[in-house]
Amino acid sequence: LTPNKLDVLSGDQYTAYLSDMISTVKNNTSSSLRSYTFLDKSPSNYYRKVFDNNTDWQKDMYRTAMTQNYKISVEGGDEIGMYDLSLGYTKSESTGKGTDFDRLNLRFNTDIKVFSKVNTELDIAYSQNSYHIMDNGWSESYDMQNIGSTNVLGLIQAPFISPYAYYYDENATDAYSSDRLRLSHEYAGKYAANGGTLMQNPFNFSNMINTGSNIMNEALRNPYWILQNGEGNNKNYAQTTQINLNVKPTYQVTKTFSISDRFNFNMNRGNEKYFLPVSGTTNYYLQDLGYVTSVQKTFFSKATTLQNDLRLNWENTYGAHHVNVFGGWRYNNYSYSYNYMQGYNNENDKLPILSKNMKYINYGGSNDNWIDMTYYFDANYNYKNRYFADFTVSSMAGSRFGDSTKDGFQLCGVSWGVFPSLQLGWVISSEPWFKTSKGINYLKLTAGVDQSGNDDLDYYAARTYWESVKVTHNTVGL
């Protein structure tokens, strides 16, 4: 893949544009014009090298990307068993530097005849997806951090500033250290302040506009510094892993009667890390908290599912009559856990470790587990594949049900729901008197009545519980 860049103003064009905008500002004086240091192109201007550049911010943030796919598959078998083994690997680069993807997947399927009346189906699958992924695109909100997307910064960063420019600030404060990279503390935002009044003004921007009770964050970060300091498996990285095991032994007791048990295990695991480095940073003010520079976030989740379906099946055909009856017990066990953590102002990009020394730490998580089981029975009949009848009934209990439900019944201290169903069908087009046409070659009429339920209940809906919560990032309460 070859990237295409968007056309934006050059440094000279941007300077000319801002000069035109300055001419529209009322009450400009020679003294006020001197505050726009980028207008002065004379060699004696101390800031000339800072603002006399033609920087193409997109130039070194993209690359020609390549995608690779590899697959090996082996299959075979005999009258005893059949098997299929496949292994695949994919690696894909993004046209944006710092972002790529790779996937490893393995799968094994087999059907084995263990004994003369016992056969087993086995399916094992493993998949792992890994991502080096930089912040990309616009965020829905920047209430909690500055813009960290390199492709966005490559479009909106001022083109007359050099990516490597430093200059000494005689008015340095604790908030602005004199040796800090000053690429976007000026001329890189949307608004300015004049006498405490905000005005739209695309040329006089500061790192932070303080208008009394309102503070606006306008300074932009250096995208190249984010690329250089943001890559790594312990920084902007995500990984998902999935494991699936499915086994089904079947015992054919007679020609018409069989017993089977299907067991399934599934696990999904996810791990995400986000890192916005301190190098090349600008101060950012969080409402009611304070100033932040770097941002670090982690998220881990794990979901497992255990399922078992024990089934007895009887099926026979008597002339034009076909009967199938089966019933069994189904068990599901679900668990889901996650935890997250977020902190600010890590002072060393080489050690991206979340610790208690970071500012405004926020964390949380959950660990949920729920179970349900169902007894079910199904009987279906058809005559000449023309007339159909099907009756089904199931009884289900779940850990998310309350102890005193209005419907169903109580057994063994839990609530059970009963869900019957009756369905009838008639294939009209199979009748001797029905004449098919080009417009209709199959016509079936079905009717039925059933009672269904809903197990999509909130995990805590049937419980009374206490929960600790953080207040203003400093206090814990109930």
Positions of PLM-derived features:
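Transmembrane beta-barrel wall of Gram-negative outer-membrane proteins
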Residues: 59-133, 149, 154, 158-169, ...
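Acidic, Ser/Thr-rich peripheral helices and adjacent loops at domain boundaries
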Residues: 139-150, 469
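Juxtamembrane/interface motifs at transmembrane-helix termini
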Residues: 140-142, 280-282, 344-346
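Extracellular/periplasmic, surface-exposed regions of secreted and cell-surface proteins
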Residues: 103, 109-118, 124-128, 198, ...
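Surface-exposed, extracytoplasmic segments of Gram-negative outer-membrane nutrient-acquisition systems
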Residues: 32-50, 276-285, 290, 471-478
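Short, glycine/acidic-rich hinge or "gate" loops at secondary-structure transitions
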Residues: 134-141, 278-279, 434-440
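Residues embedded in well-ordered regular secondary structure
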Residues: 1-97, 136-138, 166-218, 223-236, ...
